[in-house]
Structures are given as structure tokens and as C-alpha cells.
Amino acid sequence: MFTKQVTDSKAYQWFQERLEIQGIADDISTKYVPPHVNIFYCLGGITLVCFVIQFATGFAMTFYYKPTVAEALSSVQYIMNEVNFGWLIRSIHRWSASMMVLMMILHVFRVYLTGGFKKPRELTWVTGVVLAVITVTFGVTGYSLPWDQVGYWAVKIVSGVPAAIPVVGDQLVTLMRGSESVGQATLTRFYSLHTFVLPWSIAVFMLLHFLMIRKQGISGPL
């Protein structure tokens, strides 16, 4: 993987003595890829790229977004109209969010139709399903953050759905909203989920997902 000029350098020798980077590079570059693999096997990787874009653009917007009922919408308008390239950053965030959900759905279908969930890859499939749920939850929580009419009523409807569950339904609604009605506590909880809980959760399950894929390799043809 490394050229002779690189391997002869002092920097390479320094890292090689301490981390054995040649072995790591060989493991990455010589992994067997089955001949039946085609472009549809790249859908998972495209989903990852979309997430990286989401993380970068979302992080950029946290410098200007204000998660309060009174200022959320005005801060989003400020990002769109006043911040340099703010309109582009938020637009890319929205477009890549839609693309991430689409690629995730197509990836799930590809894995299911090609039997990639079968033994010995059951746990890889389980972590993938968890990642799919987290991805959808990202969309639901992010949709509310502008706190406009669309976001407000979306939160009100989504947070009211658990009320139909027997016994614990009302408690779940209160847990999601932070109170009996939709308000500041609801926005704070959705913002915390969207910017802290979900990113850490998806990072952990992505790591598990990729480690299992590296260990087991790509599934064979049907």
C-alpha cells in the first residue's frame, strides 16, 4: 500500500516501530471482495457519507441556532439570511438528511433481498435495524427544531401517538413532551436527542456494525 519512498522515510519507520502500520494497511487494502459485488453494495457506504455530511453541517449550525421557543425560528432565519453560506449549509443538511433516509431504506432492501441477514450475520442485521430506527428518529427530532407551524404540529402529533398505548401511554407522552403540553421542555428534549443522544448512539452502533462487517466479510450471492 505504501511506496518505497514512504517506507524508507524516518516518519514511516517511527510509526512502524510503535504501531505496526504496515500490518494495518495490508489488512485494509487486501480484504477480499467477492466478484458478485456491484454498485448496490455501496448503499451502506453512501449512507455513512450522508451521516458525515449531516454531522459536519449540523455542528456548524449549532453555533447560531437557539433552542428556545421564542428564538428558534428567528435563529434559523438568521442562519438562512445573515450567516455567510448559512443557506447553503442548512440546505445541504436538509438534502443529505433526505438522501440518508433514502439510502438507508434501499440498503435495508438490498441486504434483505440478497439474504445478507442470514447466519452468521444475524447480529449485523440487528445492529442495522437499530441504526435504521435511530436514523428515522433523527428525522423526527430534527424536523421540529425550526419550531415553525410545521415543526410544532409535527411534534404535537408524534408525541401524542404513544397515548394509544394501554396503561403507560400517558406517561410516555409526558416523558416525550416534558410536560402535559408541547412547549419549551419539548423543544429542549428534542434538541438534546438530536444533537447529543442520537449522534453518540448511532456512532456506537455504526462502530459495531462495521466491525462485524470487517470480521465476517461481505455475504455471498444467493
UniProtKB/Swiss-Prot annotation:
Residues forming coiled coils: none
Classify the source by domain of life.
Bacteria
Q: Which InterPro entries match?
A: Cyt_b/b6_N, Cyt_B6_PetB, Cytb/b6-like_sf, Cytochrome_b_N_euk/bac, Di-haem_cyt_TM
Topology in the lipid bilayer is annotated as:
Multi-pass membrane protein
Cofactor(s) recorded in Swiss-Prot or TrEMBL? heme b; heme c
Q: What GO cellular component term, any one, is given? A: plasma membrane-derived thylakoid membrane
User: How is the cofactor bound here?
Assistant: Binds 2 heme b groups non-covalently with two histidine residues as axial ligands. Binds one heme group covalently by a single cysteine link with no axial amino acid ligand. This heme was named heme ci.
One MF annotation (Gene Ontology) recorded for this entry: electron transporter, transferring electrons within cytochrome b6/f complex of photosystem II activity
Q: What does this protein do?
A: Component of the cytochrome b6-f complex, which mediates electron transfer between photosystem II (PSII) and photosystem I (PSI), cyclic electron flow around PSI, and state transitions.
The protein's name is Cytochrome b6
Q: Please give the organism.
A: Microcystis aeruginosa (strain NIES-843 / IAM M-2473)
Give the encoding gene's name: petB
